């Protein structure tokens, strides 16, 4: 990947000039001037997904200039580098190949002169065999009973992805009950174990190194709980490992035959497609897990092969850069109108902020422009009764992605029609608003005297011109969810490539862990500490006096 400062390109300068022409343009006028705007500013994927980006503060000229930025920063070369196994994560000297995990075409992908696909396929085959034994009941616990509950113990990418997907695909789940434990706060594991029986519980310990503090603390507590009923030799029937550290796995008591490997070129927040997704395969069955991979692979091909003007991840990435760097928008909201998707925003909060929350470029120099945005969101319509007020009438510009399926898995009365009426209404309201004239007319039509309501009119005005993307899926299936996740992954990659940052490391998580490891021994006794700054000393000493 090349090291090109985007602000030094001719395209960036052209975008700055273009912004001066666009900053006061209203979305309503863009529609008024172009009867075909929806058709021109939307694109489909596989006849299963439509992305409508027409309600944005953009014109065809805007997109041309943004695409020129992608060309001048050599985005296509970066895409080829990732797909070909080049070590684009240079700070850790690693390839970035989550695309290999779902490479359903099985074409060779080479890292260090070796095709990785045979190993990928071997782990998938092992996951298939294992999941089928658990689901069928062939696998027995230490008292001869079948497994009924599965507890995934992980954190970050080893938790967020599998949890999000198993929730999003609950309509496809089998009889196994899934539980996810991540927080080192003992409450999380304690509350989970209260409802379980050691005889019928399987634990998946997800840690590449088998040393992650939070995960291993929870894993040891789970083992202690298990050993109140079972024996040490029974651990192997109730614990499996998603790891690469065979020695540590064996020492823990897990049979290495039940260790599922993944590789350095699998980043944590891109790992649900790997052995880390074993909980997904157990929840929805391996066949559906394969469909998830297939949907993601189809989006990979779309991303790699589709021209930029119709390439969904690239379009979304460019529009995001437009708002973040030219309009000064600091956040993006992800708003799924589907209750099963309630963890989707949280998943891509990590996916985006841990990937592109960087302040130095690929040359190690501080940047003079905006990199990753703040990502947040909740399912609709709950968010409408929480934070939409600020999106509609606040002083912050918050570009939003609205996501909804046309067909619900629960055809309950008119629930889905009501849900989707809100989905359509919100993007219309955000784009077009309600003028003072309309507010005054509504009062007049209601028989109100203009003078008597004059004081309230300003509060009922909606300026509009708030940008949104609408992502409409036929329905949420393993295949379509896989494609949707991959689309957002590639959007994040595209933004990082153009903005000249390393997307696939996460050094920002290290300092806090390092300091915590120094503080932990200081909490072992009641002695006052004085080795930190005044605030930290004061907090630690008060904690010691209160505990």
Curated annotation (Swiss-Prot):
Q: Which reaction does it catalyse?
A: alpha-D-glucose 6-phosphate = beta-D-fructose 6-phosphate
What pathway is this protein a component of? Answer: Carbohydrate biosynthesis; gluconeogenesis; Carbohydrate degradation; glycolysis; D-glyceraldehyde 3-phosphate and glycerone phosphate from D-glucose: step 2/4
Q: Where in the cell is it found?
A: Cytoplasm
- Per UniProt, which keywords does this protein have? Cytoplasm, Gluconeogenesis, Glycolysis, Isomerase
The Gene Ontology CC terms held by the record are:
cytosol
Gene Ontology biological-process annotations: gluconeogenesis; glucose 6-phosphate metabolic process; glycolytic process
- What InterPro entries does the record tag this protein with? G6P_Isomerase, G6P_Isomerase_C, Phosphoglucose_isomerase_CS, SIS_dom_sf, SIS_PGI_1, SIS_PGI_2
Active-site residues from the entry:
354 (proton donor), 385, 513
Identify the main location. cytoplasm
Any one GO molecular-function label of the UniProt entry:
glucose-6-phosphate isomerase activity
- Name the Enzyme Commission number(s) assigned to this protein: 5.3.1.9
Q: What job does this protein perform? A: Catalyzes the reversible isomerization of glucose-6-phosphate to fructose-6-phosphate.
Family assignment from sequence similarity: Belongs to the GPI family.
The protein depicted here goes by the name Glucose-6-phosphate isomerase
Natural source organism: Erwinia tasmaniensis (strain DSM 17950 / CFBP 7177 / CIP 109463 / NCPPB 4357 / Et1/99)
């Amino acid at each position: 990947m090349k090291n090109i400062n985007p602000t030094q390109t001719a395209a960036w300068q052209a975008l700055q000039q273009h912004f001066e022409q666009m900053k006061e343009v209203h979305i309503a006028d863009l529609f008024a001037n172009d009867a075909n705007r929806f058709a021109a500013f939307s694109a489909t994927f596989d006849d299963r997904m439509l992305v409508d980006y027409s309600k944005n503060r953009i014109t065809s000229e805007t997109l041309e200039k943004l695409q020129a930025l992608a060309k001048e920063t050599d985005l296509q070369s970066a895409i080829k580098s990732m797909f070909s196994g080049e070590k684009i994560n240079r700070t850790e000297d690693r390839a970035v190949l989550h695309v290999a995990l779902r490479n359903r075409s099985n074409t060779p992908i080479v890292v260090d002169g070796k095709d990785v696909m045979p190993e990928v396929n071997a782990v998938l085959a092992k996951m298939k065999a294992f999941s089928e034994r658990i689901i069928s009941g062939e696998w027995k616990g230490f008292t001869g009973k079948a497994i009924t509950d599965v507890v995934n113990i992980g954190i970050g990418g080893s938790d967020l992805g599998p949890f999000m997907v198993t929730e999003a695909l609950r309509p496809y789940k089998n009889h196994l009950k899934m539980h996810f434990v991540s927080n080192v706060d003992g409450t999380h594991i304690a509350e989970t174990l209260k409802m379980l029986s050691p005889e019928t519980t399987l634990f998946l310990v997800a840690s590449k190194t088998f040393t992650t503090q939070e995960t291993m603390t929870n894993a040891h507590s789970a083992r202690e709980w298990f050993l109140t009923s079972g024996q040490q030799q029974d651990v192997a029937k109730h614990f499996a490992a998603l790891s690469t550290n065979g020695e540590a796995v064996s020492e823990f008591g897990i049979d290495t035959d039940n260790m599922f490997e993944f590789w350095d070129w699998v980043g944590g927040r891109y790992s649900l497609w790997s052995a880390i997704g074993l909980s997904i395969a157990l929840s929805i069955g391996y066949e559906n897990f394969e469909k998830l991979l297939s949907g993601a692979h189809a989006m990979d091909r779309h991303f790699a092969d589709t021209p930029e003007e119709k390439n969904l991840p690239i379009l979304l990435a460019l529009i995001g850069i437009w708002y973040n760097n030219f309009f000064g928008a600091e956040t993006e909201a992800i708003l799924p109108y589907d209750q099963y998707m309630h963890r989707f925003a949280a998943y891509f909060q990590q996916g985006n902020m841990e990937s592109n929350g960087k302040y130095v470029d690929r040359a190690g120099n501080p940047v003079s422009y905006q990199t990753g945005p703040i990502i947040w969101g909740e399912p609709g319509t709950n968010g409408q009764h929480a934070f939409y007020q600020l999106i509609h009438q606040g002083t912050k510009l918050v570009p939003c992605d609205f996501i909804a399926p046309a067909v619900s898995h629960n055809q309950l009365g008119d629930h889905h029609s009501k849900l989707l009426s809100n989905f359509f209404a919100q993007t219309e309201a955000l784009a077009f608003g309600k003028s003072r004239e309309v507010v005054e007319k509504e009062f007049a039509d209601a028989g109100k005297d203009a003078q008597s309501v004059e004081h309230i009119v300003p509060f009922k005005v909606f300026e509009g011109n708030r940008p949104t993307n609408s992502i409409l899926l036929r329905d949420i299936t393993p295949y379509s969810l896989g494609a949707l996740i991959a689309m957002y992954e590639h959007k994040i990659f595209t933004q990082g490539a153009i903005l000249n940052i390393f997307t696939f490391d996460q050094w920002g998580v290290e300092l806090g862990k390092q300091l915590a490891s120094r503080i932990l021994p200081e909490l072992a006794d009641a002695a006052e500490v004085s080795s930190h700054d005044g605030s930290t000393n004061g907090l630690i000493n008060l904690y010691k006096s209160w505990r």
